[in-house]
């Protein structure tokens, strides 16, 4: 009898712990009760990765590594590290999450820089190995702690992938003197390993809304074949440890070219696109809606 009681208790615990977890159901995102969840989100831009156009530094230091170089020239390595620590500590805080909840938001998309989680390939003592850093994970842990009491979902967005995912260095910290994500198998392997580690850490957290695998790729990738290959490799890594959370897929050309990325290769997947500097009319979405209807999947903007 004791074994039966323990088994029932475990089932109850797991079911209860995932009661708010999101998954796809046809063209909708729903919680575990089958209730549709319309994600109303905010992204703390500039928090984990400084983007020159946001920081108003484009004219002299567009990408984060360039901003950091200028600061080192100004005040040295030690003070620059202190500055970045204080920046991350104060740029986005519990007060911000409390305010977002009061304003009606129910999701936060966290733009992550890979170098807060692991070393660049150029700094690894042994090529091909991964040195893990707790800083990035601790930042996510903090947001989850702040968000959960407000029923706010946290979506993890790889904003700066190893090597950088596009020539627009301001948004992904690409350094043209080093191999990009698309020029280096070592960088791609590191990205897969990083996502697998992230998924393993948060696989049981119901307030993780999902994994946005690569933000705004913008690179000449014929037929998006390599992009799809990397997405599929990441998916395999994630699913090896986490069968539950949604996977968000952005197209090339700043998230909007999904050619070669359909049909879906996972049954819990959402296609994501970005929309800038245009009118807010239903007809403006005619180009993307066929993906939803043809493949019976949700879209996320």
Name each model-derived stretch.
Residues 1-19:
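Bacterial Sec-dependent N-terminal signal peptides
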Residues 18-105:
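N-terminal carbohydrate-binding accessory modules
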Residues 22-23, 79-108, 116-118, 124-210, ...:
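An active-site-proximal structural segment forming one wall of the substrate-binding cleft
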Residues 38-50, 106-112, 116, 154-156, ...:
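Structural recognition of the beta-strand scaffold that forms the well-ordered cores
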Residues 46-48, 114-118, 162-164, 217, ...:
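Feature marks short, surface-exposed loop/turn motifs that line or immediately flank catalytic pockets
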Residues 52-56, 122, 165-170, 222-225, ...:
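Short aromatic-enriched loop/helix-cap "lid" or pocket-rim segments at secondary-structure transitions
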Residues 71-85, 94-129, 265-279, 289-301:
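Long, low-complexity, intrinsically disordered polar/charged segments
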Residues 183-301:
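Extracellular glycoside hydrolase catalytic/binding regions
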């Amino acid at each position: 009898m004791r074994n039966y009681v323990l088994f029932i208790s475990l089932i109850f615990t797991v079911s209860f712990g995932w009661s708010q977890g999101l998954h796809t159901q046809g063209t909708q995102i729903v919680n575990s009760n089958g209730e549709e969840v319309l994600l109303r989100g905010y992204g703390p831009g500039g928090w984990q990765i400084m983007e020159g156009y946001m920081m108003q530094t484009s004219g002299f230091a567009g990408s984060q590594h360039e901003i950091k170089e200028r600061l080192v020239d100004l005040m040295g390595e030690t003070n620059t590290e202190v500055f970045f620590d204080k920046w991350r500590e104060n740029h986005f805080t519990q007060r911000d999450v409390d305010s977002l909840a009061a304003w009606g938001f129910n999701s936060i998309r966290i733009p992550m820089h890979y170098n807060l989680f692991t070393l660049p390939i150029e700094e690894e003592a042994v090529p091909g190995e991964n040195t893990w850093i707790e800083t990035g994970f601790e930042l996510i842990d903090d947001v989850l702690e702040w968000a959960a009491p407000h029923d706010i979902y946290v979506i993890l967005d790889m904003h700066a992938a190893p090597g950088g995912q596009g020539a627009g260095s301001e948004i992904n910290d690409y350094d043209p003197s080093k191999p990009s994500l698309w020029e280096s198998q070592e960088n791609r392997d590191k990205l897969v390993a990083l996502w697998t580690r992230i998924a393993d850490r948060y696989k049981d957290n119901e307030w993780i809304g999902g994994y946005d695998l690569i933000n705004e790729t913008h690179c000449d990738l014929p037929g998006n074949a390599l992009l799809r290959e990397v997405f599929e490799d990441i998916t395999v890594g994630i699913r090896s440890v986490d069968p539950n959370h949604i996977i968000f897929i952005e197209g090339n050309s700043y998230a909007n070219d999904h050619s070669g990325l359909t049909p879906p290769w996972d049954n819990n997947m959402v296609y994501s696109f970005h929309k800038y500097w245009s009118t807010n009319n239903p007809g403006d979405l005619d180009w993307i809606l066929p993906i939803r209807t043809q493949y019976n999947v949700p879209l996320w903007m």
